[in-house]
C-alpha cells in the first residue's frame, strides 16, 4: 500500500473516530444530556434533519412528547416543550424578563439593511413593529372592512357559478386571501378571483416559501449545506429571487399612487417618522412578509376548518344553525355582527388547535448566562421552542385532544381541566402576530358567507385530506367539495 493511501486511510479513520467521540459526548456528557429524549436525536443532528426534509418532523415530535414527556431533547442543542409555562418563560410574558431572541438559523438571516418583522433583532423589531402597528389597529380594520368585503363577495359570486359542481376549496380560499392581501399591501388585487386561477406571482410566492424552508435547513448545517442546496431545484431558488424583485416593483407602483386608500401602506406612511421609521428596503421586505403571513395562513386555517366541519356533521349542523338564524339577509354580515357568533369563534379556535397553520417549532436562543424554563435551568445558547401541533394534541393539555370539539372553548365541564393557555397559534409576548384581529375578522367573515350561501359535501378523494407533510407550513393537497345552493335561499343579482 502506498504512503499516500495510508495517509488518506489514517485521516478517514481519524475523522470517523472524532465523529464517534462527538456523538458519545453529545449523548452522555453534553450539558443537555440529562433531558429526556431518544439518545440518537441527542447524539447527532442527522435524525432531526432527516425528518425535516421528509416533512414528518411535527408528527415525530408529537410522538416523542407522548413517550418522553413535556420537555424533550430533539437534537444535541435543542429542547422542545409542550407545557404552557414554557411560553411565558421563553417569550418573557408576565415574567419581567425580556423575550429570548429568535434563532437566526431557524428564522433565516436578516437581509443586509432590510430586516423583516419576522427575523429582526430586538431593537429593529420594536421599531418596525411600532410603525406597522398602525395598519392593524381597530380603526384601521374598520376602514379596511369595505375593501375586505368586496373580495369576499366576489368569491361568493364566483362560487355560485359552480353550483352543483365539485371545487377545490384550498384554491378558492387562496384566491380570496391573496387577492385581499395584494390589495391591502400593494393597492391592487392579483386577479385570482377574476380569472379563477392563480396569478403567476402567487404561484411563485407559494413555491418560494417552500424553497425558503429548505434553504434555512441547509444553512443550519454548514457541513451539509452544499449537498442540501443541490437538492433544491434551481427554478425554485430562482422563483424566490423573482418574488423579491416583483415585490419591489409592486411596492414602487403603489407608492407612486397619490390617492388615499385604507391599505397597509397608507397607515404606515402616515405614521412614518424620519428618525425611527422604515427605510424603503424595509418596506419592501415587510410587504413581502405580510403577503405570506396574512394570506397563506388564513387560507390554510379556512381549508382545515372546512375539512373538519365536513368530517364532523354534528358540529357543522350546529354552526349552520347559528349562522342561518342569526342573519335575516346576507347584507347583515359585517365586522360587528360576526363578532356575535359565539359558536363560530369556538369552531375557529378548535380549528387553530387541531390544525394550526404553522404547526412546528419557532426556535428562540437562551441568553448566554442561561435561563430557567419550566422550573429547570437551561444552559445558554440552547435552542428552545414550543411545538404547536404537539402541544395542542397532547393529553397533558387537552381532554380528547385528537377530536374536533368546539365546546371545549364554551365552558363544558368535561373540558374544565384543559390547559387552554397553551394554545398560542399567533404567538405571544412582544413578537406576537400583529394581524391577529384582522385574521379572526377575515376567517369569520369568509366562513360565514360560505355557510350562509352553500351546503357543502366532502368528496371521497378528500376523505384523508389532513394526512399532510409539513415544510414550515402544511403541504396541502386539493380539498374537493361539492357545492350545493342553500335550499330556499333567494339570490339577488
UniProtKB/Swiss-Prot annotation:
The chain crosses the membrane at residues 5-25. Its EC number is 1.-.-.-. Glycans are attached at residues 174, 286. Keywords: Glycoprotein, Heme, Iron, Membrane, Metal-binding, Monooxygenase, Oxidoreductase, Transmembrane, Transmembrane helix. Asperterpenoids A and B, but not the final product asperterpenoid C, exhibit potent inhibitory activity against Mycobacterium tuberculosis protein tyrosine phosphatase B with IC(50) values of 3 to 6 uM. The keyword Iron applies. Heme binds at residue 433. It holds the Pfam family p450. Belongs to the cytochrome P450 family. This is Cytochrome P450 monooxygenase astA. It comes from Talaromyces wortmannii (Penicillium wortmannii). The gene is astA.
Amino acid at each position: 500500500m502506498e504512503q499516500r493511501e495510508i495517509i488518506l486511510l489514517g485521516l478517514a479513520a481519524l475523522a470517523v473516530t472524532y465523529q464517534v467521540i462527538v456523538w458519545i459526548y453529545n449523548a452522555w456528557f453534553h450539558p443537555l444530556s440529562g433531558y429526556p429524549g431518544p439518545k440518537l436525536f441527542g447524539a447527532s443532528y442527522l435524525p432531526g434533519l432527516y425528518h425535516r426534509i421528509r416533512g414528518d418532523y411535527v408528527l415525530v415530535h408529537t410522538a416523542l412528547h407522548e413517550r418522553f414527556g413535556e420537555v424533550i431533547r430533539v437534537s444535541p442543542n435543542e429542547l422542545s416543550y409542550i407545557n404552557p409555562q414554557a411560553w411565558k418563560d421563553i417569550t418573557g410574558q408576565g415574567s419581567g424578563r425580556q423575550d429570548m431572541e429568535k434563532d437566526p438559523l431557524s428564522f433565516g438571516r436578516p437581509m443586509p439593511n432590510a430586516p423583516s418583522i419576522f427575523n429582526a433583532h430586538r431593537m429593529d423589531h420594536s421599531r418596525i413593529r411600532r410603525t406597522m402597528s398602525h395598519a392593524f389597529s381597530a380603526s384601521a380594520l374598520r376602514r379596511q372592512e369595505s375593501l375586505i368585503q368586496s373580495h369576499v363577495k366576489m368569491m361568493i359570486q364566483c362560487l355560485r357559478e359552480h353550483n352543483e359542481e365539485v371545487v377545490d376549496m384550498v384554491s378558492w380560499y387562496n384566491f380570496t386571501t391573496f387577492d385581499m392581501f395584494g390589495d391591502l399591501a400593494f393597492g391592487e388585487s392579483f386577479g385570482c378571483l377574476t380569472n379563477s386561477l392563480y396569478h403567476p406571482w402567487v404561484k411563485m410566492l407559494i413555491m418560494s416559501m417552500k424553497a425558503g424552508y429548505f434553504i434555512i435547513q441547509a444553512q443550519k448545517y454548514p457541513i451539509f449545506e452544499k449537498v442540501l442546496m443541490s437538492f433544491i431545484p434551481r427554478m425554485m431558488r430562482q422563483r424566490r429571487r423573482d418574488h423579491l424583485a416583483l415585490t419591489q416593483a409592486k411596492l414602487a407602483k403603489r407608492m407612486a399612487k397619490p390617492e388615499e386608500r385604507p391599505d397597509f401602506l397608507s397607515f404606515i406612511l402616515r405614521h412614518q417618522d424620519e428618525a425611527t421609521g422604515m427605510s424603503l428596503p424595509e418596506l419592501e421586505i415587510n410587504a413581502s412578509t405580510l403577503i405570506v403571513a396574512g394570506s397563506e395562513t388564513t387560507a390554510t386555517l379556512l381549508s382545515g376548518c372546512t375539512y373538519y366541519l365536513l368530517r364532523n356533521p354534528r358540529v357543522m349542523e350546529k354552526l349552520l344553525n347559528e349562522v342561518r338564524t342569526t342573519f335575516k339577509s346576507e347584507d347583515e354580515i359585517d365586522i360587528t355582527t360576526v363578532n356575535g357568533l359565539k359558536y363560530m369563534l369556538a369552531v375557529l379556535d378548535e380549528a387553530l388547535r387541531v390544525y394550526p397553520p404553522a404547526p412546528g417549532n419557532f426556535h428562540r436562543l437562551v441568553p448566554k448566562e442561561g435561563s430557567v424554563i419550566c422550573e429547570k435551568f437551561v444552559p445558554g445558547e440552547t435552542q428552545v421552542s414550543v411545538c404547536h401541533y404537539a402541544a395542542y394534541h397532547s393529553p397533558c393539555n387537552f381532554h380528547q385532544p385528537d377530536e374536533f370539539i368546539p365546546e371545549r372553548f364554551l365552558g363544558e365541564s368535561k373540558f374544565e381541566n384543559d390547559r387552554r393557555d397553551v394554545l398560542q397559534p399567533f404567538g405571544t409576548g412582544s413578537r406576537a402576530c400583529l394581524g391577529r384581529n384582522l385574521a379572526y375578522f377575515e376567517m369569520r367573515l369568509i366562513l360565514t358567507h360560505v355557510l350562509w350561501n352553500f351546503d357543502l359535501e366532502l368528496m371521497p378523494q378528500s376523505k384523508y385530506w389532513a394526512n399532510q407533510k409539513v415544510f414550515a407550513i402544511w403541504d396541502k393537497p386539493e380539498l374537493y367539495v361539492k357545492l350545493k345552493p342553500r335550499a330556499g335561499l333567494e339570490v339577488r343579482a
